[in-house]
Design a protein with these regions (language model features):
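Phosphate/diphosphate ligand-binding glycine-rich loop within oxidoreductases
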Residues: 4-121
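Short, conserved loop/helix-junction motifs that constitute active-site signature segments
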Residues: 5-6, 125-126, 148, 220-229
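Glycine-rich adenosine-cofactor-binding loop
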Residues: 16, 108-111, 127-151, 158, ...
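Short beta-strand elements in bilobed, periplasmic/extracellular small-molecule ligand-binding domains
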Residues: 36-44, 154-155, 181-184
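Receiver (REC) domain switch-region micro-motif
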Residues: 66, 130, 204-205
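NAD(P)-binding Rossmann-fold cofactor-contacting core
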Residues: 149-179
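Rossmann-like adenosine-cofactor binding region
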Residues: 180-229
């Protein structure tokens, strides 16, 4: 990479803590090299309490844009010039673009990526009924983007734990910002309500840890609910 760095090379980066494990620098720098872009991507370890100082430093350096990971995804919003509609509703950013005049705009691409992947597989969310399992950050992003893209109904199911209040907050925000989408939240422990919702939905989303090790053999839904059509 050093052989292509010049005085004109544009810097992009990731901030958060920890970032040593991130594959983003390798991925972006490989892409820059393959496409011939005069750019470089680095990762900076920025703890939560240094979020503001980190953002100001990046503005001073004139970076072309940056990504944000935990624990700065929520805090960074306060130090940006504007937020995309999705980022504003989600309350967190993972990407910041920089305009020619230096203005910073925060985006959340988690939900966009989910909806775009569905589209690429011939599935549209507009007018559809979604059941979303989970109420964490990924679930929130998916719900918000689906609502903004015209989903008719979103039923969130989450265990009655510390994330349940987050799900309630998401429902309240969607009711105000996207009144055309009917959003609700129900305890995951209500198996009868879950079975009924899944039976009537068009798209079922698992945004929980179930399915990943060590929960890779667990399931939140009895397989008898599904039908092969």
């Amino acid at each position: 990479m050093e052989s292509r760095i010049s005085g004109h090379t544009k810097l992009f980066c990731l901030i958060g803590s920890p970032v040593g494990h991130s594959g983003s620098p390798a991925m972006y720098n490989y892409s820059f090299q393959r496409t011939g872009l005069d750019a470089a991507y680095l990762a900076f370890n920025i703890p939560l309490e240094q979020t503001e100082a980190g953002v100001q430093a990046l503005k001073t350096l004139g970076v072309g844009g940056f990504n944000i990971t935990m624990p700065c995804k929520t805090a960074v919003a306060a130090y940006l010039d504007e937020l995309s509609p999705a980022a504003r509703l989600i309350g967190a950013c993972n990407t910041v673009t920089v305009s020619e005049d230096g203005r910073l705009t925060g985006h959340n691409t988690d939900g966009v990526g989910f909806v775009r992947n569905l589209h690429e597989h011939g599935i549209e969310v507009k007018g559809q009924r979604l059941v979303v399992l989970g109420a964490g950050g990924a679930a929130t992003a998916i719900c918000v983007q689906a609502a903004l893209d015209g989903a008719a109904e979103i039923a969130i199911f989450n265990r009655d734990d510390e994330f349940y209040a987050n799900g309630q907050h998401t429902v309240e925000k969607l009711a105000q910002a996207v009144p055309g989408c009917k959003a609700s939240i129900t305890p995951l422990e209500d198996s009868a309500a879950l079975a009924e919702a899944v039976k009537n939905c068009d798209i079922l989303v698992n945004a929980t840890k179930v399915g990943m090790k060590p929960l890779d053999r667990d399931t939140l839904i009895h397989t008898s609910i599904f039908r092969a059509d």
